[in-house]
């Protein structure tokens, strides 16, 4: 009976040991710095914002990770410096990462993926609205610097392509490319 219980305990422990160190969770402070382009309105801009962000990375191999970032921000839209109102967006971004050095203290990585941006809580000047949510690409580069066995300081930069329409009373006024560069610093824990 004891041998059977020991065998059952070993079998139950296998998945846990197989998953050891396959996950990383990071908490970052990020600066979302839009690189705004408008198809027909010169002077249209969207404010830069610092916000908290959380992300999860699953390592499918020692050098290959899949990261999902989650964060939201509220920006002010302006035209030639005059406020047009505020809008919020949620751009979950999924990237496939390559980690160059999976074991040393300094672990640089690069990634590429996609984002889906959902605009919500849009409070623009009367008659103005955001016309659509957005799918776009994402590129990233970063480094994890070990400070403990499983703890890391993280520096990260992403370029995310976000595109929508601005409408006036339901009629498309302009195409708006927000396309932010996202700078981040944070702490990660691998488990």
Where are these regions (language model features)?
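Predominantly the C-terminal beta-signal and adjacent terminal strand-loop region
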Residues: 75-79, 86, 148-191
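Short, conserved structural micro-motifs that define repeat-unit consensus positions
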Residues: 26-28, 55-59, 140-146, 152-154
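Hydrophobic membrane-targeting alpha-helices
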Residues: 13-17, 99, 147
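Outer-membrane beta-barrel and related beta-rich outer-membrane complex signature
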Residues: 37-41, 80-82, 122-124, 166-169
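Cleavable N-terminal export/targeting peptides
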Residues: 1-22
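Transmembrane beta-strand segments of Gram-negative outer membrane beta-barrel proteins
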Residues: 20-33
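Gram-negative (and chloroplast) outer-membrane scaffold detector with strong preference
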Residues: 21-22, 55-124, 134, 183-191
């Amino acid at each position: 009976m004891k041998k059977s219980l020991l065998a059952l305990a070993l079998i139950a422990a296998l998945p846990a040991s197989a998953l050891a160190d396959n996950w990383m969770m990071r908490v970052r402070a990020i600066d979302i710095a839009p690189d705004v382009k408008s198809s027909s309105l010169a002077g249209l801009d969207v404010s830069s914002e610092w916000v908290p962000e959380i992300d999860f990375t699953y390592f499918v191999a020692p050098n290959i990770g899949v990261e999902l970032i989650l964060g939201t921000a509220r920006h002010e839209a302006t035209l030639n410096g005059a406020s047009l109102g505020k809008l919020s967006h949620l751009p979950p971004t999924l990237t496939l990462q390559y980690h160059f050095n999976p074991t040393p203290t300094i672990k640089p990585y690069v990634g590429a993926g996609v984002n889906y941006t959902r605009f919500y809580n849009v409070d623009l000047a009367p008659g103005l609205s955001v016309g659509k949510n957005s799918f776009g690409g994402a590129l990233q580069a970063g480094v994890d610097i070990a400070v403990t066995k499983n703890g890391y300081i993280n520096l990260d930069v992403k370029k995310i392509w976000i595109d929508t329409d601005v409408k006036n009373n339901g009629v498309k006024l302009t195409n708006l490319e927000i396309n932010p560069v996202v700078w981040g610093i944070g702490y990660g824990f691998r488990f």
